[in-house]
Amino acid sequence: MTDNSKIRVVVGMSGGVDSSVTALLLKEQGYDVIGVFMKNWDDTDEFGVCTATEDYKDVAAVADQIGIPYYSVNFEKEYWDRVFEYFLAEYRAGRTPNPDVMCNKEIKFKAFLDYAMTLGADYVATGHYAQVKRDENGTVHMLRGADNGKDQTYFLSQLSQEQLQKTLFPLGHLQKSEVREIAERAGLATAKKKDSTGICFIGEKNFKQFLSQYLPAQKGRMMTIDGRDMGEHAGLMYYTIGQRGGLGIGGQHGGDNQPWFVVGKDLSQNILYVGQGFYHEALMSNSLDASVIHFTREMPEEFTFECTAKFRYRQPDSHVAVHVRGDKAEVVFAEPQRAITPGQAVVFYDGKECLGGGMIDMAYKNGQPCQYI
């Protein structure tokens, strides 16, 4: 049996069941485990539900139960500078950001990793549903989590080889139901705690109300592609491409009874475009441009390859051809795709392996830019 007692693993503990079981499994495997709670958001001046204090109590309870030391570290400044400023800038530009991708890249696997090194860590570990596998050359490959419904490689796609070399994902081979069972068997304080939802720093708060505290909403016209005025929108930042709810025009029909969807935005004119039908022609595209292209292991500066891709979390894979030039890529779809959303991540896969990805800049239909922003 391997002696892991001299290998120190610092676990990012959120107060949830996944990170609790992560710490427990590593402790049972004989590692020298330290728990760390990250406080990334100052909730003292906000209305709504925020659970940071309660979450830290849960971390302390679990750490005491399994017999590991634990600390709390404050990354509020790093979070504001590296994640929240990006989040606001994307909304100002009419895009729909993905703060979870940026949070993993900049906070959980950069600021936290750096902090863990000061504690003498050999590795960091989190409760993400993903797997790492080292090949004979020492290169680490990131693989999808065994639980298809929980796989989180989409959100981890911007991690570097250097970060992956220092990372363990102890839950990657487990189903979520098994994780709950392990927690209940061990009697962990978090065994029955419900999973957190929504963007990390917003929690359960009303999104529109939250965003309006930081960005002034500018109302404007809501129109169909052919120029029919459908009323007023509350501010372009509140809508995302392909969105159905929250338009307030459910009773207005243009010749058919199909529901209305957001099909485009004109930032310069402050117009929100809407159309009827889930597969409205304005929502369909056959290629995209992406930037901030990043691979989890070394790749050529310029190359073309075929793979599968996801354009949003929990979406089935789609076949694509990718041409990479530096940190930019053109991605051509084998089949037309719906509601490709600027600001969201495009993530590349080769079977079970997550290769990396980038951020969507523009979607195209037959070579013409889609008027999504």
Swiss-Prot record:
Q: Where is this site: Interaction with tRNA?
A: 128, 344
Q: Which gene encodes it?
A: mnmA
Question: Which SUPFAM superfamilies would you find in this protein's record?
Answer: Adenine nucleotide alpha hydrolases-like
Q: Which residues form the active site?
A: 103, 200
Its GO CC terms are: cytoplasm
Q: Which reaction does it catalyse?
A: S-sulfanyl-L-cysteinyl-[protein] + uridine(34) in tRNA + AH2 + ATP = 2-thiouridine(34) in tRNA + L-cysteinyl-[protein] + A + AMP + diphosphate + H(+)
Which organism encodes this protein? Streptococcus pyogenes serotype M28 (strain MGAS6180)
Q: Can the keyword Nucleotide-binding be found in this entry's annotation?
A: yes
> Any idea which GO molecular function terms this record carries?
ATP binding; tRNA binding; tRNA-uridine 2-sulfurtransferase activity
Identify the stretch(es) annotated as Interaction with target base in tRNA: 98-100
Q: Which NCBIfam families match?
A: PRK00143.1, trmU
Q: Give the protein's function.
A: Catalyzes the 2-thiolation of uridine at the wobble position (U34) of tRNA, leading to the formation of s(2)U34.
Q: Under which EC number(s) is this enzyme classified?
A: 2.8.1.13
Matching Gene3D superfamilies: Adenine nucleotide alpha hydrolases-like domains, HUPs, Translation factors
Q: What class of enzyme is it?
A: transferase
Quick one: where's region Interaction with tRNA? 150-152, 312-313
Cellular location of this protein? Cytoplasm
What's this protein's family per the entry?
Belongs to the MnmA/TRMU family.
Q: Tell me which UniProt keywords the record has, alphabetically.
A: ATP-binding, Cytoplasm, Disulfide bond, Nucleotide-binding, RNA-binding, Transferase, tRNA processing, tRNA-binding
InterPro entries cross-referenced by the UniProt entry:
MnmA-like (IPR004506), MnmA-like_C (IPR046885), MnmA-like_central (IPR046884), MnmA-like_central_sf (IPR023382), Rossmann-like_a/b/a_fold (IPR014729)
- Its name, as the record gives it, is tRNA-specific 2-thiouridylase MnmA
Query: Which parts of the sequence bind ATP?
Result: 12-19, 38, 127
**Which cysteines in this chain are paired by disulphide bridges?**
103-200
Q: Which CDD domains match?
A: MnmA_TRMU-like (cd01998)
